[in-house]
Structures are given as structure tokens and as C-alpha cells.
A protein has these predicted regions:
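Conserved short beta-strand edge segments in small beta-sheet-based binding/regulatory domains
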Residues: 56-66, 101-102, 134-144
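Extended Gly/Ser/Thr-rich low-complexity repeat segments
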Residues: 126-136
Length: 144
């Protein structure tokens, strides 16, 4: 729904919509965009475009990010696992920063049992980090 709407914008070459972690809702929609060469659309303009063109309110993205190039599969489709990792890193780092912790996501790994897991590096205690990240549906662990 989000991708189809954005692809109607003449500045958008590719769009990849995913659910980004949210401590209250579980996940919220967000979208990563690759513009056509020479396009000048801004993230704010694309977010407004989505508000006008994505009819379902729950599907309207809460975050739009323009990337120089979206990750793609061998057949040219947007590779969403990399976008999910990027969103987890962005959301978790923002939450940790807002809480005043020095902890940051080092990487996000794909665990066969738990799915995507954020690996966090920090001098902060596990309890301090859990107080911030414990409300998110995606797990975290201390990085190596």
C-alpha cells in the first residue's frame, strides 16, 4: 500500500516499506526510498505525499528516509531484511540516546530462533539497557 502510493511520485525510483520497532504499538510503518537521478524530493515532502496518498491511516508511515540506493536482491527487488536492521538500529539508538545512555547498537544479527537481534555495545549495565529496550518486541543482547 505504502510502496504503491510512493511509486506514484515521479521522484521515486524504489520504495521499501517495513515495520519499525515501537515500544507501545509493537511496530509502526516506515519506508525507505531511492529517488530517480536528479530528483529533489525531501523526506518531509514524501511523508506529506504519503499522508495524502495512503488511504489507510494505520498504514501511513511514521518515518520516511531517502537512501542513495536501496539494497536489492539479485533479481532487482528491494531487500527488506537490511532495511529492518537499519530501522532497528535507528530506533534503538534514538531510545538509548533519549534515555541518556552511551549504549549503541553495534550490529543487528539474524538469529535462527529469535529473528533479528540487536547487539548493543556499552559501558551501561544490562539493567539500564533493558529499562530502555525491554519494551520493544525485537530482542537485544550485549555485543561481543
Amino acid at each position: 500500500l505504502i510502496e504503491e502510493a510512493l511509486l506514484g511520485n515521479s521522484d521515486v525510483a524504489f520504495a521499501g516499506a517495513i515495520g519499525q520497532p515501537d515500544a507501545h504499538a509493537g511496530e509502526l510503518p516506515c519506508v525507505y526510498v531511492e529517488l530517480i537521478e536528479g530528483a529533489s524530493a525531501t523526506e518531509a515532502e514524501l511523508l506529506e505525499y504519503c499522508l495524502q496518498n495512503v488511504p489507510e491511516r494505520a498504514a501511513q508511515p511514521k518515518h520516511v528516509e531517502i537512501m542513495p540506493e536501496l539494497p536489492k536482491t539479485a533479481v532487482g527487488k528491494v531487500f527488506k531484511p537490511d532495511l529492518r536492521k537499519k530501522a532497528i538500529t535507528r530506533v534503538y539508538d534514538a531510545a538509548l540516546d533519549e534515555a541518556g545512555l552511551s549504549a549503541r547498537v553495534q550490529t543487528v544479527v539474524d538469529d535462527k530462533k529469535r529473528g533479528l537481534v540487536a547487539q548493543v555495545s556499552s559501558d551501561n549495565s544490562d539493567d539500564e539497557i533493558s529499562a530502555v529496550l525491554g519494551g520493544f518486541s525485537r530482542p537485544w543482547e550485549r555485543g561481543v
